[in-house]
């Protein structure tokens, strides 16, 4: 057949040549493939018909070729198994053992031009198809094509809905034997894969491989742009696309481009609207029956996955896995910059962006940039105004499901995260982490401009604006500008007079939820925050922080006009109005203007006649709390005189 390489024009010329030179040529009707023997041709055709005449008596598995059955039988015999000296794992074929050994050596001799390397030539061949777009394996049922034959085999089960592998313990079925094997480990708690470095054990073989990277701190592939380093060149190649804006993976359906291939794969699901598994309760549809099974638990309230440590139950196994970390308190992933430790490597990766200040994800609508794609997705909802997550208890709607979950705790009163130091409880683990810094005094977030440190990152972000003097958020009503959108929102309430936060105890209303929280302490008389310097106690921690400045005599906020210094930035802002003569807060009743909203609020009481501050001793009411305080001295004097007379 060597002389046939001259016939490159096509199949017809090759066929003509073979017919004249060979008397026994057998051809495949489906593809351009030729055979010298009828037996070989018949064997090959069996693949296309789907017939599997050769059956294993031991397990019932069928094959299209006798050779494949003979190879399969060795699984049951296991006489000539080849064992790995490194981990003890046994293999039927020596070639499989050779491939497996590369897991331990880390050898990846098959390299492609994009920088990615592989330990098997078959993996390289499959990877090449990503770049070429070649998908040789096509589903006859729906026409979907795949890079790998194994993907096609798995895909076919969607049409047949066949799940032949069943868990004997729970009855759950799977379409792959490997998935069943992995699932079984969940029940028996077996962790056969151990890290030689630290002794940590894992239930899945691939997990210790990922875990080992923690110990090997070698990151030889460095980004020239931001000096970020990676262990693999392929990861660096992907990272560089953030700076270049390159998006080589394009969706054929809508034209949308992506920088990562896996993101394109996830995106494609949007276009394939096949959702055959529908919930009878609410009508929601899913592509997979397992997703429907999980969804149904919302209606039934079933929570089959129980935590052995605290007894808490969950509807999804993955949530139980995440929950278990609370009890271990293990945080193996540490930030080299600030020393903060994390339970997951993905969380550490997200955290690192704080130090680099890199914001690669930009909103096309308003130009605002973010350090996480998830934050950008959440931000986009601002422009659409969509709030799909609604509270069944009070009807309030939210942009995020996580915000709804946290909101629900208001109705239940649940605060599962408790501080061991002072007993204070929180509804979020992140709030507990932040709270703990009060006791430790840890301030990991430092301002590069002035060196001031903060315990919360958001406080650092707010602080940075002091150095820039930028005020992008302007009030349309009075023209006043602010450096934060949240302050503008609060300011707007001056014009509207809106006070949505009401005290259930006395009926007093507030513009801010934080003001209501502070006010509530009046009724409880609880003052858990004590000053170590003078012993004075406070109901709010922020008030203690402000108070501490008195002892240090530090006044970091200086007026450029007259040189006067202040403890607080807000006091400086209030003071500045003296020089400008600005009076933005106007009374709608009489037209009188004030330089501060608090003065306007006090003034309004003249028109309403409202006297909210009442003396408990004699019942006399006052417009201002300061007037009530002065009045109380009268009773103290009377009480003293009565005591002396007695």
Curated annotation (Swiss-Prot):
Question: What domain of life?
Answer: Eukaryota
Q: What is this protein called?
A: Zinc finger protein 493
Q: Where in the cell is it found?
A: Nucleus
The organism encoding this protein is Homo sapiens
Q: Does the keyword Lyase apply?
A: no
| Gene Ontology biological process | regulation of transcription by RNA polymerase II
Transcription keyword on record: yes
The molecular function terms in GO held by this entry are: DNA binding; zinc ion binding
| Zinc fingers classed as C2H2-type: ranges | 26-48, 54-76, 82-104, 109-131, 137-159, 165-187, 193-215, 221-243, 249-271, 277-299, 305-327, 333-355, 361-383, 389-411, 417-439, 445-467, 473-495, 501-523, 529-551, 557-579, 585-607, 613-635
Q: Which InterPro entries match?
A: Znf_C2H2_sf (IPR036236), Znf_C2H2_type (IPR013087)
Under the heading PROSITE patterns, the entry gives: ZINC_FINGER_C2H2_1, ZINC_FINGER_C2H2_2
Keyword annotations for this protein, in alphabetical order, are: DNA-binding, Metal-binding, Nucleus, Repeat, Transcription, Transcription regulation, Zinc, Zinc-finger
Q: Which GO terms describe its cellular component?
A: nucleus
Look up the signal peptide feature and give its range.
none
What function does this protein fulfil? May be involved in transcriptional regulation.
């Amino acid at each position: 057949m060597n002389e046939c390489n001259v016939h490159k024009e096509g199949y017809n010329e090759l066929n003509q040549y073979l017919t004249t030179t060979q008397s026994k040529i057998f051809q495949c009707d489906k593809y351009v493939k030729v055979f010298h023997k009828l037996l070989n041709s018949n064997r090959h055709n069996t693949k296309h018909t789907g017939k599997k005449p050769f059956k294993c008596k031991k397990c019932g598995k069928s094959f299209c070729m006798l050779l494949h059955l003979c190879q399969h039988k060795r699984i049951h015999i296991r006489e000539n198994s080849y064992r790995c000296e490194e981990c003890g794992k046994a293999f039927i074929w020596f070639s499989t053992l050779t491939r497996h050994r590369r897991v331990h050596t880390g050898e990846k001799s098959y390299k492609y031009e994009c920088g990615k390397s592989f330990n098997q030539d078959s993996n390289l061949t499959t990877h090449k198809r990503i770049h070429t777009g070649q998908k040789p394996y096509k589903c006859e049922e729906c026409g979907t094509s795949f890079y790998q034959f194994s993907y096609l085999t798995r895909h076919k089960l969607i049409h047949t809905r066949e799940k032949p592998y069943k868990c004997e313990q729970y009855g759950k079925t799977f379409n792959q034997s490997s998935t069943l094997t992995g699932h079984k480990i969940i029940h028996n708690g077996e962790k056969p894969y151990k890290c030689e470095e630290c002794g940590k054990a894992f239930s899945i073989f691939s997990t210790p491989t990922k875990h080992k990277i923690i110990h090997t701190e070698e990151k030889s592939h460095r980004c020239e742009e931001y000096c970020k380093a990676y262990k693999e060149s392929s990861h660096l190649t992907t990272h560089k696309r953030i700076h270049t804006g390159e998006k080589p993976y394009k969706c054929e359906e809508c034209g949308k481009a992506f920088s990562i291939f896996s993101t394109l794969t996830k995106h494609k699901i949007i276009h394939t609207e096949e959702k055959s598994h529908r919930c009878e309760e609410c009508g929601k549809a899913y592509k997979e029956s397992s997703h429907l099974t999980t969804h149904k638990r919302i209606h039934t309230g079933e929570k089959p996955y129980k935590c052995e440590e605290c007894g808490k139950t969950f509807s999804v196994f993955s949530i139980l896995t995440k929950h278990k970390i609370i009890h271990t308190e293990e945080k193996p992933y540490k930030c080299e910059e600030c020393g903060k430790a994390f339970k997951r490597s993905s969380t550490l990766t997200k955290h690192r962006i704080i130090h680099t200040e890199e914001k690669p994800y930009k909103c096309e609508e308003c130009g605002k940039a973010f350090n996480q794609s998830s934050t950008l997705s959440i931000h986009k909802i601002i422009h659409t105004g969509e709030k799909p997550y609604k509270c069944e208890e009070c009807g309030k709607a939210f942009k995020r499901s996580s915000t709804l979950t946290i909101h629900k705790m208001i109705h239940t009163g649940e605060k599962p995260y408790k501080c061991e130091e002072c007993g204070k409880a929180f509804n979020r683990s992140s709030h507990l982490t932040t709270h703990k810094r009060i006791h430790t005094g840890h301030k990991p977030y430092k301002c590069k401009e002035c060196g001031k440190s903060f315990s919360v990152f958001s406080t650092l972000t707010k602080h940075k604006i002091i150095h820039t003097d930028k005020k992008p958020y302007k009030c349309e009503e009075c023209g006043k500008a602010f450096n934060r959108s949240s302050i503008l929102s609060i300011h707007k309430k001056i014009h509207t007079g809106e006070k949505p936060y009401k005290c259930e105890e006395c009926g007093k209303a507030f513009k801010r939820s934080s003001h209501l929280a502070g006010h509530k302490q009046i009724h409880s008389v609880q003052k858990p925050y004590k000053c170590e310097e003078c012993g004075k106690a406070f109901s709010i921690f922020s008030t203690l922080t402000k108070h501490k400045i008195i002892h240090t005599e530090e006044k970091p906020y200086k007026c450029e006009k007259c040189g006067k210094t202040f403890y607080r930035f807000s006091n400086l802002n209030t003071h500045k109005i003296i020089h400008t003569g600005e009076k933005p807060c106007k009374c709608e009743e009489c037209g009188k203007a004030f330089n501060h909203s608090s003065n306007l609020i006090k003034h309004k009481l003249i028109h309403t006649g409202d006297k909210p501050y009442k003396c408990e001793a004699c019942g006399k009411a006052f417009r201002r709390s300061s007037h009530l305080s002065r009045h109380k001295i009268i009773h103290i004097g009377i009480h003293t005189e009565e005591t002396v007379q007695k």
